[in-house]
Amino acid sequence: MRCGSREVFVKIQEATNPEWGKPPSRRSAEEHIKYSLVLLDKPRGPSSHEVAAWVKKILGVERAGHAGTLDPKVSGVLPIAVAEGTKVLLALSRSDKVYVAVAKFHGDVDEGKLRAVLGEFQGIIYQRPPLRSAVKRQLRTRQVYSIELLELDGRYAVIKMHVEAGTYARKLIHDIGEVLGVGANMRELRRVAVSCYTEEETVTLQDVADAYYIWRKYGDDTYLRRVLLPIEEIARHLPKIWVRDSAVDALCNGAPLAAPGVAKFEAPFSRGELVAYFTLKGELIGVGRALVDSEEVKKMEKGLVARTDRVVMKRGTYPPLWKRRGEGAKA
């Protein structure tokens, strides 16, 4: 999880034509809804799919999709992309997560021993998905970036864990109990962060409903814009590449990003890493997979920089200059 600032490297100083596209802040309320992200605080009870369906119904859109499923009994951060924004949910598909769990041990445990055992689970661990899992039950490795004891009260413990996507917190608690020799089960779980998105930023379903009602009833979209983030926020954690106006439409048509289309970019990033394409006005075009690392991009004058995987911007938002100039289907 890279949530800190990156260095921006400018390859070419270029202005953007104000006649094409628009900064996200200048979108109409309807456009804002169509290209938005909701950082929802999912309550315990409903499934993630049910919650996403409620958001879709409240906002009157055809599609809404969530990233990182939470079981019905689990609460916390659930990113939901709305309408066109669902096209770039890939940006969050492999994001790391932070959970706070309440564990109950089946016997008395010493705090010092518990802390020592938790330390053994930091790093690469092996996990087999639970019996009720939707995925094939094959043994696999997952990274536990950190795990700490927040509180111990009798046989109950509050444990905070920062883990790789796809890690089963319930199984982790079970395995900790096995190593301690007393057994354990998870009594409660809350997700407090997804990548750079924390529970302090979340909103409730009631917030979404109220914001939409106020806009429809009174024409005031101030609250709506606070509750629904612009879809650009879905790429907050990704390295960004800003492209020249002449390259935008090619990317919208699924073309790979070539070096001449790059105006500036954030470093560092590695070959194979997911990157986000932006216009010079700050609009999210889509996401792709880097074909070279950022150090190579600094020196490149030709060749491919990234493969385009998902596109959110509508074709024709910027004119197809790449066709007029006979550059072929490369941005």
UniProtKB/Swiss-Prot annotation:
MF terms in GO: RNA binding; tRNA pseudouridine(55) synthase activity
SUPFAM superfamilies reported in the protein's UniProt record: Pseudouridine synthase, PUA domain-like
Annotated Pfam families: DKCLD, PUA, TruB_C_2, TruB_N
Electron transport found in the keyword field: no
GO biological process, one term: tRNA pseudouridine synthesis
UniProt keyword annotations, A-Z: Isomerase, tRNA processing
Transmembrane domains' residue ranges: none
Active-site residues per Swiss-Prot or TrEMBL entry: D71
Signal sequence annotation: none
Source organism superkingdom: Archaea
Family membership: Belongs to the pseudouridine synthase TruB family. Type 2 subfamily.
Protein name, per record: Probable tRNA pseudouridine synthase B
Organism: Pyrobaculum neutrophilum (strain DSM 2338 / JCM 9278 / NBRC 100436 / V24Sta)
